[in-house]
Amino acid sequence: QQRYLNAKRYVKLAIVADRSMVTKHNGKLKKLRKWIYRIVNTINEVYRSLNILVALVYLEIWSKEDLINVTSAAKDTLASFGNWRATDLLKRRSHDAAHLLTNIKFDGTTVGKAYVASMCQQDSSVGINQDHSKINLLVALTMAHELGHNLGMSHDVVNTEKQCNCGTCVMAPTISDQISKLFSNCSKNDYENFLTLYKPQCILNEPSKTDIVSPPVCGNELLEVGEECDCGSPETCQNPCCDAATCKLTSGSQCAKGLCCDQCKFSKSGTECRAAKDDCDIAESCTGQSADCPTDDLQRNGQPCGNNAQYCRKGKCPIMTNQCISFYGPNAAVAPDACFDYNLKGEGNFYCRKEQATIFPCAQKDKKCGRLFCVLGPTGKRISCEHTYSQDDPDIGMVLPGTKCADGKVCNSNRECVDVNTAY
């Protein structure tokens, strides 16, 4: 648990500057970009204390017209920006969170708004920020504050039972000239709780050099174009393989970090760098030519797993019993074959396939690839065939593709029980 909490995180940030920002900078896009690069450098500095690096991986400037309706109603603007990000921006450019920068003044004293504990979520990993000051630092701290909400942080409240007692930390409810670059203990706890509860996956991946669109800054701990390594400032760098002042490898070093970097040299070929997680995963080993562990690879589809009783599919070992347990708890088991006869009827929720409104009953050989039936606890004389159905997602409660349905056979994506050798 502690290792998971202490792991370095990377927020790959996309920033969108709207038309009002272009007008504010008199159409000088170069000047506007510089303003935004400075903001991101500050945000990255602020977050380094939490072992988070923030990298700008995309910058979009709406120089002709706004692609959403940006208004003084912050709540509405946030909702439409989130919707636009999910339906448009995410399809074009991979990133973890998107923030809007606008010169439109929001109602009341609001200078920013963001969804809380939403990092990595499709439509809510967003924030909106007003470019409310001539002082770059104050705008940067506003965006850092809104990003804090995405990462699960609520406002610091002074003199409550929580005793954050930091009136000037990043998550202070109101902005002031005394604002600092520090996070309160409350913010740190909120962030750790968010990691534990939501387990956001997207921020575990480091951006590649070429993903980062802002000019490289030696000493910001992000590996950027033109750098061989970046271990932070000369004062804080603790990596003997990297020269902090130049971001070049020290003399005789082959690497500065990586799962296959050992004491500044590439690990020997064959050194295991990622263990197999389970039957359907493959262990990876170093090549001897690189500091990186090869891409995570999976066992081939159809490879036996689960004590040779099941078969792998896309890195998972789909077991019918486990599917019952996930719906009904640890005492659940797969129902007797008689229950699966319901799937032969093709009535109600019992079928193999549904296309538009047409229901296709299962053929006798395919009945264990349709609706899943389970029993709860020990069965008496009467068996109740438990099943699950969802109006929203017709696939919920169906036997998962790749599940064994007979000896040497698995359910394919058409819910037919086919020979495992022809299924893949």
Curated annotation (Swiss-Prot):
The keyword Ribosomal protein does not apply. Its proteolytic activity is inhibited by EDTA, TPEN, 1,10-phenanthroline, and some thiol compounds, but is enhanced by alkaline earth metal ions (Mg2+, Ca2+, Sr2+, and Ba2+). Its activity is not modulated by urea (4 M). Ca(2+) 2 binds at V217, N220, L222, E224, E227, D230. Residues 9-207 form the Peptidase M12B domain. Disulfide bonds join C120-C202, C164-C186, C166-C169, C218-C247, C229-C242, C231-C237, C241-C264, C255-C261, C260-C286, C273-C293, C280-C312, C305-C317, C324-C374, C339-C385, C352-C362, C369-C411, C405-C417. The disintegrin domain belongs to the long disintegrin subfamily. Negative results: does not show hemorrhagic activity. PANTHER family: ADAM A DISINTEGRIN AND METALLOPROTEASE DOMAIN, DISINTEGRIN AND METALLOPROTEINASE DOMAIN-CONTAINING PROTEIN 28. This is Zinc metalloproteinase-disintegrin-like brevilysin H2b. It comes from Gloydius brevicauda (Korean slamosa snake). It holds the Pfam family ADAM_CR. GO terms for cellular component: extracellular region; plasma membrane. Ca(2+) 1 binds at D96, C202, N205.
